[in-house]
Amino acid sequence: MGKVYDWFEERLEIQAIADDISSKYVPPHVNIFYCLGGITFTCFLLQVASGFAMTFYYRPTVAEAFASVQYIMTDVNFGWLIRSVHRWSASMMVLTMILHVFRVYLTGGFKKPRELTWVTGVILAVLTVSFGVTGYSLPWDQVGYWAVKIVTGVPDAIPVIGSPLVELLRGSVSVGQSTLTRFYSLHTFILPLLTAVFMLMHFLMIRKQGISGPL
């Protein structure tokens, strides 16, 4: 085992990386509220794991979506638990994200030189809410259907570009299969990819600049 470690150490300098991670200075004023960002990230990982598990059984069609969700809940081994974890961690992610934003704002963590860290955080907050909007419609029950109909109809009030925006969101004039397909693609591919990219940027900036000092 030692020879294997030495082989990797010689090429990747693993010990230097480990020392850098473990020796990062943590200011004495840091308390439990500074963990909210990490809790949000943990919830995101739970979302990815449980969501990936459900893609094996979920069918993104208006005719089969609701039945496939019912199948997950009643017939798939531990399916009810996987979906419940997905829902609970989604709610927890939104809650901890909001608390994290408030904590950063109230402690002045958005000030120079951390403006870009704040910007990436705000973008992540928007992406988190977008997860909720797109995921809410996927069971394609009455609640999900009318929710997506209302949400996609909001831009219609914008002059000139309102109607084209509604059609872009829905995939057609009315809510239907095209809408569900778009929301499924957003929820399972586009939003997770964007979130991963901005989280990486967010973490690298925090790593570079460190935790902000007290007010």
From Swiss-Prot:
Keywords: Chloroplast, Electron transport, Heme, Iron, Membrane, Metal-binding, Photosynthesis, Plastid, Thylakoid, Transmembrane, Transmembrane helix, Transport. This is Cytochrome b6. Its main location: plastid. Heme b 1 binds at H100, H202. The gene is petB. NCBIfam families: PRK03735.1 (NF002990). Belongs to the cytochrome b family. PetB subfamily. It comes from Coleochaete orbicularis. One of its GO terms (cellular component) is chloroplast thylakoid membrane.
